């Protein structure tokens, strides 16, 4: 793990705050940066002419789907223009990125309210103040502006990503990788999952977001927890999701012979026995009971990470059953049969 980016990101966030009431100069600097490095300014407004900008969108300029070379070029340009003293990062472990097609935190000028960008700046300032002092006043101001921004167009889970960028030891990133990772019992304790699971069904308001943050920080204090910070959690989530995605792509090419086909029927039956839905752990336990699996069969490890073979195969089976419409994936940490899953006539290969 290499978190060299944190010093740069936090210093830049602090300097960016000084432009809260001088956005014209900030926009001028952005144009200057891109001109100096020889890259076109991305589309940030309807007519390609930036009239206003928020700080999280500025961070998004170098935290989206671009090459590492261009990313480092932009960071060098920013360092020069804003006199950043921290080292230019070349490693970005644990940094979530935006979709290139959704890289602004505001709607274009004809679709946004006059106060939308102002509100984001207020949240940005409140977040930095909160990170420096978790006082009652700072916490309340953060809650106030987070909840205001929460209701604005173009704001979804990206708001938690933006907060994490600017103060990664204070705010938790709730992008899709982290949400997926945190509700897996292989990665976090049951007590934690039970406490946060329902809070991840939709973008949380400030009170629930801070509750998730606080519960997570409390979990980090446990001697058994291998993560001690939000950046470490994000890093491990990225590593694991990349591993799973790679395996899924590999298996996709030979799906007809996939070893996890054997779990289609047992998984559907297990969820039926559970009343139509259950946690991954409940589903696996029901499969063990129904199939009379031995401890030896469900304890086999494989791969460099010593991943549990049974749990992985059931997870892959679930992914394919989601793709084919038999299991619903809308609720994190809960596997639920669709109407098709409830009524399908089961064979070994469905």
Label for each model-derived stretch:
Residues 254-281:
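Positively charged, polyanion-binding regions of nucleic-acid-associated proteins
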Residues 322-332:
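A short, conserved structural fragment
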Residues 333-338:
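Minor-groove-contacting beta-hairpin "wing" of winged helix-turn-helix DNA-binding domains
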Residues 196, 258, 288-315:
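Short, positively charged loop/turn segments that connect secondary-structure elements
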Residues 1-152, 168-250:
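An N-terminal alpha-helical hairpin/helix-loop-helix interaction module that forms a charged
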Residues 168-169, 272-276, 289-293, 330:
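Short helix-capping/hinge SLiMs at alpha-helix to coil transitions
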């Amino acid at each position: 793990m290499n978190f060299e980016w944190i010093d740069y990101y936090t210093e830049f966030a602090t300097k960016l705050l000084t432009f809260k009431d001088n956005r014209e100069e900030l926009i001028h600097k952005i144009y200057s940066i891109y001109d100096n490095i020889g890259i076109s300014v991305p589309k940030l407004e309807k007519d390609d002419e930036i009239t206003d900008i928020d700080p999280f969108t500025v961070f998004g300029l170098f935290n989206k789907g671009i090459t590492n070379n261009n990313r480092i070029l932009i960071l060098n340009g920013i360092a020069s223009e804003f006199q950043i003293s921290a080292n230019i990062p070349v490693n970005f472990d644990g940094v979530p990125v935006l979709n290139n097609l959704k890289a602004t935190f505001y709607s274009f000028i004809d679709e946004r309210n006059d106060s939308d960008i102002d509100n984001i700046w207020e949240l940005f300032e409140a977040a930095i103040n909160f990170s420096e002092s978790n006082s009652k006043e700072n916490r309340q101001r953060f809650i106030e502006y987070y909840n205001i921004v929460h209701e604005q167009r173009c704001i979804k889970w990206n708001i938690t990503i933006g907060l994490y960028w600017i103060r990664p030891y204070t705010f938790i990133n709730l992008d899709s990788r982290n949400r997926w990772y945190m509700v897996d019992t292989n990665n976090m304790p049951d007590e934690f999952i039970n406490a946060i699971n329902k809070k991840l069904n939709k973008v949380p308001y400030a009170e629930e977001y801070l509750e998730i943050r606080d519960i997570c920080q409390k979990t980090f204090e446990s001697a058994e927890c291998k993560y001690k910070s939000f950046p470490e959690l994000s890093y491990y989530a990225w590593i694991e999701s990349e591993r799973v995605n790679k395996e899924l792509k590999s298996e996709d090419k030979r799906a007809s012979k996939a070893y996890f086909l054997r779990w289609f029927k047992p998984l559907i039956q297990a969820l039926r026995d559970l009343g139509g839905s259950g946690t991954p752990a409940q589903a696996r336990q029901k499969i063990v009971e129904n199939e009379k699996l031995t401890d030896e069969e469900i304890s086999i490890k494989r791969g460099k990470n010593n991943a549990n073979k049974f749990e992985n195969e059931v997870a892959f089976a679930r992914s394919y059953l989601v793709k084919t419409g038999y299991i619903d994936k809308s609720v994190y940490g809960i596997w639920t049969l669709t109407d098709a899953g409830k009524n399908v006539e089961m064979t070994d290969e469905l």
